[in-house]
Amino acid sequence: MGRLLLSIAALLVGVSGAAFGQTSLVSEIAPGGKLRVGMIAITVLGGVAEPVAAFVGQKLGAAVEPVMYPNPEAYLQSFGKAEWDIAIGPRVLAPTDKADSTANLWAISLVYVAAPGTEFPDIASVDKAGVRIGTIRGAPSDRVLTREIKAAEIVRIPLSPTIAADAADLLRSRKADVFGADSGVGYPAADALTGARIVPGAFGTVLVAAALPKGRSPAAQALLATLVEEARQTGVVQKAIDAKGLKGVN
């Protein structure tokens, strides 16, 4: 049955949005010809998601309306509130009782940025008594660190439009010895602080997927899954990653 739905969705994708216009299936995903897309306002997430959203909207013949959330916590809290028609963000932030997610679209490495003058030869060396690890409050990195860190202290700061600079300032002031975040923040933070460096390895991975609100039909789920997979297969995702100059993202 699942394969049949995907085949039907693939056939629909081959027809332009104008051609199948406001069918019940398209209307189920984009009511009234408008596609509201929930995203997180950070380059490695929203910056890559926007071209994917534009691709999906074009295929559906729908006008895209970005719904940008300022931080991961606000994005998480949006589920179940009918604020968007589809969402594109970390899989871990899409509650399974409130949304149905597609396959993964891209993956983001979680990295540590070490403050100048510190010695952390590898990931394992970070979790020691007396070490302070900075991170973004409520982000997937925060979830991983909260679960895995046993001895070090976690110092949380809010996500902001200047988060890489904020992370660098935290390290510069030695309020943190390392900063753990997605690579979209980690590498720019390291570049912003002379003497800072990326600790070899990754302490986790953030998987990004699209999601529909719970309760949409299997056919609508299959259509969205097919559209975002086409965006991945045709290079829309990779071009967005390359255009933003992101490292540790694939």
Name what the model sees in each region.
Residues E50-K59, A124-R132, A139-P140, A209-N250:
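Extended ligand-binding regions for polar small-molecule ligands
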Residues E73, I88-K98, V144-R147, R172-G204:
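A ligand-binding cleft/hinge motif common to bilobed small-molecule-binding domains
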Residues G38-I42, M68-E73, A82-A94, P116, ...:
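Beta->alpha turn/N-cap motifs
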Residues G2-E65, A74, Q233, Q238-N250:
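N-terminal hydrophobic or amphipathic helices and topogenic motifs
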Residues E50, A54, Q58, A63-D127, ...:
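Acidic, polar ligand-binding/catalytic clefts
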Residues T23, A63, P140-S160, G195-I198, ...:
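Ligand-binding clefts/hinges and TM-proximal coupling segments of bilobed small-molecule sensing domains
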Residues R36-K59, Y112-T162, G184:
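Bilobed "Venus flytrap"/periplasmic-binding protein-like clamshell domains
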Residues G32, W106-A115, A190-E229, K244-N250:
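Periplasmic-binding protein-like
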